[in-house]
Amino acid sequence: MCEKYDVAIIGGGVIGSSVAHFLAERGHKVAIVEKQSIASEASKAAAGLLGVQAEWDAYNPLFELARESRAIFPQLAAVLREKTGIDIGYEEKGIYRIAQNEDEKERILHIMDWQQKTGEDSYFLTGDHVREKEPYLSESII
């Protein structure tokens, strides 16, 4: 069998499958090359987090790409729901970085500073404030 394709996508996870879908919608003939079944490797093991702000301790150019990816995710979730009826339960929640000593607190404040300079919402909560929202967190959190 000798098929001809416009594009070959290596990997049939969430990203590869999404790219293949949108290319096919635009009229491209697409092949997905996957060693197992669709979404059986990294996509299967992923926690489902879009932790753009949790990935880097210092500014990294990949941060901008990750932010763009996060920005289009609500649209992708809506398209998936519309076309398949699958609701992935997308929610925008945020993430905590926890400090248990002054060095960790300073590191978090540094991260918060550069993230705010990029326009991200990032702010410091005291241990008491965090425990109001998450009461089972340790008293050692400052």
Describe the predicted segments one by one.
Residues 18, 41, 106:
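Residues that form or flank phosphate/diphosphate-binding pockets in enzymes
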Residues 138-142:
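Short, intrinsically disordered, charge-balanced linker/junction segments flanking boundaries
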Residues 5-32:
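N-terminal Rossmann-like FAD-binding beta1-loop-alpha1 element of flavoenzymes
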Residues 49-133:
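Dinucleotide-binding Rossmann-like beta1-alpha1 core, especially the glycine-rich loop
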Residues 1-2, 90:
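Short, flexible hinge/linker loops that cap or flank conserved catalytic cores
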Residues 24-46:
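Glycine-rich FAD pyrophosphate-binding loop
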Residues 2-8, 41-46, 51:
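Accessory recognition modules or surfaces
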